[in-house]
Amino acid sequence: PHFLVRTKNMELHTDFSQRVILHTEQMPWLPSPAAGVERRQLDRQGEEVARATSIVRYASGSYFAAHTHGGGEEIFVLEGVFSDEHGHYPPGSYLRNPPGTTHTPFSEPGCVIFVKLWQFNPGDAQTVCQQTEQGSWGPGRQEGIQVQLLHEFQGVRTVLMRLEPDLQVQLHSHPGGEEILVLEGDFADEHGEYSKGSWLRSPPGSSHSPKIGPNGALLYLKSGHLVAPVMPLPN
């Protein structure tokens, strides 16, 4: 599966006290153990079984062997159609496969997905399959922000956030850290500028005041997870 790699113990951006900014669309695609499947690794801790955040690209007709998610798997479909024996998932699909679940993923037309592995709270056994293109939106923390809730469990919150063009977002802090993947549009803050494909991880206790670009922005945003318990990796 996505996390099998024949390397020595790998540590990539595992210090959650540090800010990480990656412009993923400029990163090279690296081969995975499965033919036709490549990835961009954003953070990673572990050997063959790893706690990892990646962007994964399936070529048309590629697939993985059946595998079990020992620590859970979270997927957001960015492009194309991702599939397994349970269904077909178009762009905007949000999936959570809790610890102990098994599937055999593939893609007939090809796809690009954002994947987080082995990052479930030990008590979280909820399966999620949400089509965000048809999802409902509610008000965010200030006027000009709309939020679609994807998942929430014991202080960890995952949402899609839609922000109006040229919006100045009020200064706010991230007590449990924050992670953003820019899906559309762009924004800037005190630490940098971010466009489609930018991934930023802000440490617990950090703060910022984003200014949204002239075309607005659509973000995948997770908060609280950098201080939350997760399933332990096997020894």
Annotate each PLM feature.
Residues 3-48, 110-155, 235:
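A short, N-terminal "cap"/entry segment at the start of jelly-roll beta-barrel domains
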Residues 37, 88, 99-123, 204-230:
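Ligand-binding loop in jelly-roll beta-barrel domains
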Residues 54-55, 65-69, 86-87, 105-106, ...:
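Short histidine-centered beta-strand/loop micro-motifs
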Residues 59-62, 69-84, 174-190, 196:
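Glycine- and acidic-residue-biased ligand/ion/polar-headgroup-sensing regions
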Residues 64, 76, 82, 95, ...:
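Fold-core signature of tandem repeat domains
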Residues 83-100, 189-208:
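Short acidic-glycine-tyrosine-enriched beta hairpin
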Residues 132, 138-184, 189:
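Surface-exposed interaction/gating patches
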